[in-house]
Amino acid sequence: MVYTEQFYVGYSDCGADMTLSNTALLRYFENIASMHGAAVGDSPLEVPYRWVLLSYHECVLRRPKFNSRVTLKSWNRAVKGVTSCREFELYDEGGDLICTAISNWVRVDAETGKLQRLGEAVAEQYGSEARGNFDSPWIPKLKEAAVYDVEKRYMVERNFIDANRHMNNVCYLDLANCVLPQAVWDKGESNTFSIHYRKASYYGEELTCCYGSGETGATVVVKGGEGDVRAEVAFER
């Protein structure tokens, strides 16, 4: 089952160039995933578990402009053990494909946080589609940079917290953007990027964002107070 929804590219969805930003794109993905879930009886208002994001990989071919409408398609591609794969396709008003993305998720008990094993019933519920735009449904782990050029500290404020009572996945991309050197940011947002989530962050915690550059792009690692990795963001050149 391919779930389809239209989105309006509003002012708050755009960067300085008045095209869709990466953070807005992730919010579109987050919303259509929850819409699909609600459509098949998997609404967080009705079930005793939550879907938690493990990783994203996005490839933007072209960015839609402000005041346009886009069509987003999403489907469950595969289920294995405790992990599920969801893919996305974004189309412009002319029907041209302008972005592909893949994501991996786990399902946890809403009260205990314990991982739940996923079976064929989940694949049937979501009407899994085997097709995909990526070779594998499973996103490989990122390698941490050996040296960091910049480090900044941030507090987890209330506006970072979502319905799962921890820092929302999109906020990690916001923090990664904030730690990028101005010269890097001025070149424009990366059209190919990956995010891996390692551990939840909570209100009142202090996080350290570490930026490092390499031959293929830049990496930002978000760490907790004990130096434990919370998330990794890789921007390709």
Locate each region found by the language model.
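Hot-dog-fold acyl-thioester-processing enzymes
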Residues: M1-L53, T100-I102, D109-E189
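Acidic/His-leaning functional-site neighborhoods
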Residues: Y148, Y154-E236
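Short aromatic/hydrophobic contact patches that present stacked aromatics
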Residues: Y8, H57, S194
